[in-house]
Amino acid sequence: MASLMENLISILQEECDAYDKLLKFSMDKTPVIVSEDLKELERITDEEQTVVSDINRIDKKREQVTKDIADVMNMDVHKLKLKTIIQLMAKRPEEQEALEKSYDRLHQSVHQVENINRENA
């Protein structure tokens, strides 16, 4: 179980890093959209698509690890959310804290990307 949690933490950190890259591209796009620089917009969009593909790949890894954790804990994977896993880790405070930090960072990064993308629309 410990290795599954370590794996989940690592995957969440990887996903956070990918979202941070996506956020940077989204922020870079704003002035490019305003200046109507279509070549630069195309370049940034191509790089964004690469990062989105990476995020999809990482998300599949996270889903698999979550499924493995659900199997070990004899729980329904569809009801096992990250917040639930964090709560269940109360007896392992170090892992719980690492998971919570990764979850919060991921949640914040996703929210920032959504906000910038709304502005760019």
Per-range role (PLM):
Residues 80-121:
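Short terminal interaction segments
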